[in-house]
Amino acid sequence: MALIPGELFAEKTLYINREKLRRYAEASGDHNPIHLDENFAKSVGLPNVIAHGMFTMALAGEAIRFWVGDEWQIVDFSTRFTKPVVVPADEEVGITFSGKISEVSETNIFIELSATSAGVKVLGQTKARLIF
């Protein structure tokens, strides 16, 4: 793949469900009930259980890896969480990532990306710097 500034990547959709949230909670130690307990999430004004922000960001990293391959290493990564990813019971929820190469140097590439779920922007101003 030629790495050209301005090049757009094909959209990549990754899917999550309640079981993946449970497994992420176990691995991360983040057992906040807004991510696991529908009644609790609704009691604090959320529409339903929501995905962990860092899990959503990790999936953005997976999309980057899909686009550029394993030769490149992410060394800087930042995002703004614009809206939560809502995960209803018994549903697979898609998160669609889109991105572009913003800059290329001899040893670095810079990628900008965003993510939507159910038509709502969930990540914004997401930037990554990768080295070869």
What are these regions (language model features)?
Residues 1-9, 89-132:
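HotDog/MaoC-like acyl-thioester-processing domains
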Residues 28-29, 41, 75-77, 128-129:
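Short, charged/polar low-complexity linear motifs in solvent-exposed/disordered segments
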Residues 1-51:
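Catalytic strand-loop segment that frames the active site of acyl-thioester-processing enzymes
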